[in-house]
UniProtKB/Swiss-Prot annotation:
Protein name per the record: Large ribosomal subunit protein bL17
Similarity comment: family membership: Belongs to the bacterial ribosomal protein bL17 family.
Subunit comment: Part of the 50S ribosomal subunit. Contacts protein L32.
InterPro entries from the UniProt entry: Ribosomal_bL17, Ribosomal_bL17_CS, Ribosomal_bL17_sf
Single GO molecular function: structural constituent of ribosome
A Gene Ontology BP annotation from the UniProt entry: translation
Any one cellular-component term (Gene Ontology): cytosolic large ribosomal subunit
Length: 117
C-alpha cells in the first residue's frame, strides 16, 4: 500500500532522482516551457514552486539557497532576478501542466510544464 507516501520514485535511486529534478528545473528556467512525462512534470512542479517561493525574497540568502539546489549560476541568476519577481504578488501556483499526447514508443503520457505568465 502507498498510503501517505509523499513523492514519486520515478523508477530511480534517490541521487538519480535528485539529479533528474535539478536538470529538469534548469531546462525549465532556461527555456520557460519543457515537455516531459506527466509523472515527472507533477513531481517537478513542487520542486520548482518551492524554489520560486524562496527566490522571491531576492536577497543574497535567496541566491545561495537556489544555487545550493541548482548548482548552475546562469539558471540561478535568471530565476532570482527575472522569473521570481514576476510572481511577487502570487501565493503559489507559479507553474502550469498541460497534458499533450501519448508517446508512441512506450505509451507514456506526456505533458508540457511552463511558468504562468
Amino acid at each position: 500500500m502507498r498510503h501517505k507516501h509523499g513523492y514519486r520514485k520515478l523508477g530511480r535511486t534517490s541521487s538519480h532522482r535528485a539529479a533528474l529534478l535539478k536538470n529538469l528545473t534548469i531546462a525549465l528556467v532556461n527555456s520557460g516551457k519543457i515537455e516531459t512525462t506527466l509523472p515527472k512534470a507533477k513531481e517537478l512542479r513542487g520542486y520548482v514552486e518551492r524554489l520560486i517561493t524562496r527566490a522571491r525574497l531576492g536577497d543574497f540568502n535567496a541566491h545561495r539557497a537556489v544555487f545550493a539546489s541548482l548548482q548552475d549560476k546562469n539558471a540561478t541568476n535568471k530565476l532570482v532576478t527575472e522569473i521570481a519577481p514576476k510572481f511577487k504578488d502570487r501565493n503559489g501556483g507559479y507553474t502550469r501542466i498541460i497534458k499533450t499526447r501519448i508517446r508512441r514508443g512506450d505509451a507514456a503520457e506526456m505533458a508540457f510544464i511552463e511558468f504562468v505568465a
